[in-house]
A protein has these predicted regions:
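Short, composition-biased local secondary-structure segments
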Residues: 59-60, 87-90, 107-120, 145, ...
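Glycine- and other small-residue-rich loops at beta-strand/loop junctions that grip anionic moieties
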Residues: 47, 133, 171, 193-196, ...
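Residue-level signature of catalytic and energy-coupling elements of molecular machines
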Residues: 20, 58, 154
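Auxiliary Fe-S-binding modules of radical SAM enzymes
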Residues: 1-39, 212-364
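Conserved Radical SAM active-site core
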Residues: 16, 65-192, 196-213
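Local cysteine-cluster metal-coordination motifs and their immediate loop/turn environment
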Residues: 48-65
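Hydrophobic faces of well-ordered beta-strands that scaffold small-molecule active sites
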Residues: 41-45, 97-99, 129-131, 152-154, ...
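Glycine-rich, proline-tolerant flexible connector loops at the mouths of alpha/beta enzymes
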Residues: 42-48, 68-71, 98-111, 162-163, ...
Length: 364
């Protein structure tokens, strides 16, 4: 995975984010078409394999045991139950399954043994297997990799500066360390954040800049709109504006042209037209199913209808290989030249002021 060298400073990235929306969307759509099939969107399924009872205090999360959200705590699911849900997901068009457990960190116990078995079973189905289990060390990452784990999700959530306003039980550096452990084990990295928590545009870009400064940016970058859940500290936050979501997706697409930009939480508050704008701006994945861990998500039939309307097809998994390598500099220079040629052609077609004579109109 590579980054766009034009926007490898915070100042340049902020200017990009704040550029006229139509220009921003056009640039993002152009880059998206250079690196991805714009009519393919990956359908992923997120399964909450262990729900609630988390000791962390993430202000947005209804699974924290510190908040009263009426969420029923559920133990780790049985292996065959999870495999059955994965089979249903595959039959419905999903090529990726992400298993989420409300843990602060992975522990070397029977529950982890069961998760490893789940990974092995789903990997054997020819699907991309992703997991989000909290912090993990290098040895645990290696074990998951050997079991067939394709990707590990560990979001940064926001910028390092804003992070302390929403979480106190886990340090920002601990998140970066977990990403590093997954990366060094040879696991694909999925990491993104949430907008609408009260952060500024600079905070949103600050999160993306953390990925810019990594040795390799994430293969997947999920962009979530806050789902304000009653009982959490962020319950009174206003819904995210569609335009903010489009800006964040477009900026992410331009800065990380090879990565999969995932349109994640918050789609229930978005119209079909709003989601179409996100796809146009570079989103190339959604989560299918009526829930994202514990929060609502559009029903499967609604997504099928949306795909049909937009002419989208479900993307096959990268299970048998890696995301295709691209030559960024070469492609961008080629695209820049093509745009310059088109602009010159349009300019030459315009009548020169000296040659232009206004048409005379007789008035009776």
């Amino acid at each position: 995975m590579k980054i766009n060298p034009t926007y490898n400073t915070k100042e340049a990235a902020i200017a990009l984010y704040n550029s006229p929306l139509m220009d921003l969307m056009y640039q993002a759509a152009t880059i998206h078409r250079e690196y991805h099939n714009p009519n393919e969107v990956q359908m992923s399924t997120l399964i909450s394999i262990k729900t609630g009872g988390c000791p962390e205090d993430c202000s947005y999360c209804p699974q924290s045991m510190k908040y009263h959200t009426d969420l029923e705590v559920q133990p780790l699911m049985k292996v065959d139950e999870v495999v059955g849900l994965a089979k249903n997901a595959k039959a419905s068009g999903s090529s990726r399954v992400c298993m989420g457990a409300a843990w602060r960190n992975v522990r070397d116990n029977r529950d982890f043994d069961k998760v490893v078995e789940m990974v092995q079973e789903i990997n054997g189905m020819g699907m991309e297997v992703c997991a989000t289990l909290g912090m993990l060390d290098a040895a645990q990452a290696e074990r998951l990799k050997n079991a067939g784990l394709y990707a590990y999700n560990h979001n940064l959530d926001s910028s390092q500066e804003f992070y302390k306003d929403i979480i106190s039980t886990r340090q920002y550096q601990e998140r970066i360390d977990t990403i590093k452990n997954a990366r060094e084990a040879g696991i694909s990295v999925c990491s993104g954040g949430i907008i609408g928590m009260g952060e500024t545009a600079e905070d949103r870009i600050g999160m993306l800049m953390t990925y810019v400064h990594m040795e390799q940016p994430p293969e997947s970058i999920p962009i979530n709109a806050l789902v304000a859940v009653e009982g959490t500290p962020l319950q009174d936050q206003n819904p995210v504006l569609v335009w903010d979501m489009v800006r964040m997706i477009a900026t992410s697409r331009i800065m990380f042209p090879e990565s999969i930009i995932r349109l994640s939480a918050g789609r229930t508050e978005m119209s079909d037209e709003a989601q179409a704008l996100c796809f146009f701006a570079g989103a190339s994945s959604i989560f299918a199913g009526d829930k994202l861990l514990t929060t609502p998500n559009p029903e499967y039939n609604a997504d099928v209808a949306l795909f049909k309307t937009l002419g989208l097809t479900a993307k096959s998994p990268f299970q048998d290989g890696v995301q295709p390598e691209t030559k960024y500099d070469e492609k961008v220079e080629k695209a820049k030249q093509a745009r310059a040629d088109r602009a010159a052609k349009v300019a030459n077609a315009q009548p020169k002021s000296a040659d232009f004579e206004p048409r005379k109109v007789s008035v009776k």
